[in-house]
């Protein structure tokens, strides 16, 4: 059995790491490179960087910091933000990123997933899915351009349908960003994770809602996710990654220590 992964998420805007609540009201956390170094030293298995306004601004992720991160950390990292072409992805990979992640551009052009997988291999291609639970309909729905409050929009896709679609097109990994839970630290949406897990054959990462160590344990034990992504609990030093891994290991979860 593969070790479960602990993945700090760094939302990037204007060259700094920021964090919001339910994708709104972002506060500045700090500089990108020192935070990346800190998490690598604390025992993170990998890092994910989201340039949160790149897609809504119509630009690709700022590459200047990607190469700096590659120089200072020795763990894998994934970069997302406005990647609309095979060439965009190639540049980011050439600057040292191990994976690229696409979200809104994949919704605009689903063939991008297969083109990226064909060129760089499925192991490099992560698809992020911003999913919102609609209480009126009881459905999980996919949203697009969530980095910009003015442009955020619901798509025609239901989450479970889109999860299956991206796998068929060559996604090597799926990150499920549960918008209702984002930043509120009340726990991952275990019901949604379990539903998605049933239709997911590739590695699946939970994102949105971690507030205490037990939330990670629940995601691994009850929803069988492959990795758990979190931001504010690490940024605000509510949870130490080494201590989290010790806790998980003591509770029967295989992790790298």
From Swiss-Prot:
It catalyses: 5-[(5-phospho-1-deoxy-D-ribulos-1-ylimino)methylamino]-1-(5-phospho-beta-D-ribosyl)imidazole-4-carboxamide + L-glutamine = D-erythro-1-(imidazol-4-yl)glycerol 3-phosphate + 5-amino-1-(5-phospho-beta-D-ribosyl)imidazole-4-carboxamide + L-glutamate + H(+). One of its GO terms (molecular function) is imidazoleglycerol-phosphate synthase activity. It comes from the Bacteria. The active site is at 11, 130. It is an enzyme of class 4 (lyase). IGPS catalyzes the conversion of PRFAR and glutamine to IGP, AICAR and glutamate. The HisF subunit catalyzes the cyclization activity that produces IGP and AICAR from PRFAR using the ammonia provided by the HisH subunit. Belongs to the HisA/HisF family. This is Imidazole glycerol phosphate synthase subunit HisF.
């Amino acid at each position: 059995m593969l070790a479960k992964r602990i993945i700090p998420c760094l939302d990037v805007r204007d060259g700094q790491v920021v964090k919001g609540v339910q994708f709104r009201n972002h506060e500045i956390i700090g500089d990108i490179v020192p935070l990346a170094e800190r998490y690598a030293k604390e025992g993170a298995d990998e890092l994910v960087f989201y340039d949160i306004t790149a897609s809504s601004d119509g630009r690709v992720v700022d590459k200047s910091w990607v190469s700096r991160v590659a120089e200072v950390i020795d763990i894998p990292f994934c970069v997302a933000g406005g990647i609309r072409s095979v060439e965009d992805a190639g540049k980011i990979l050439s600057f040292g990123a191990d994976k690229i992640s696409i979200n809104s551009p994949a919704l605009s052009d689903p063939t991008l997933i297969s083109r990226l997988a064909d060129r760089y291999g499925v192991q490099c291609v992560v698809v992020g899915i911003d999913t919102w639970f609609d209480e009126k309909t009881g459905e999980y729905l996919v949203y697009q351009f969530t980095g910009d409050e003015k442009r955020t929009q619901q798509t025609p896709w239901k989450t479970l349908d889109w999860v299956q679609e991206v796998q068929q097109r060559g996604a090597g990994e799926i990150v499920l960003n549960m918008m209702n839970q984002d930043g509120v630290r009340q726990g991952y949406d275990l019901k949604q994770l379990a539903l998605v897990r049933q239709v997911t054959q590739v590695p699946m990462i939970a994102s949105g809602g971690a507030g205490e160590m037990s939330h990670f344990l629940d995601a691994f034990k009850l929803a069988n996710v492959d990795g758990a992504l979190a931001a504010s609990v690490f940024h605000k030093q509510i949870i130490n990654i080494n201590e989290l891994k010790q806790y998980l290991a003591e509770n029967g979860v295989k992790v790298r220590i």
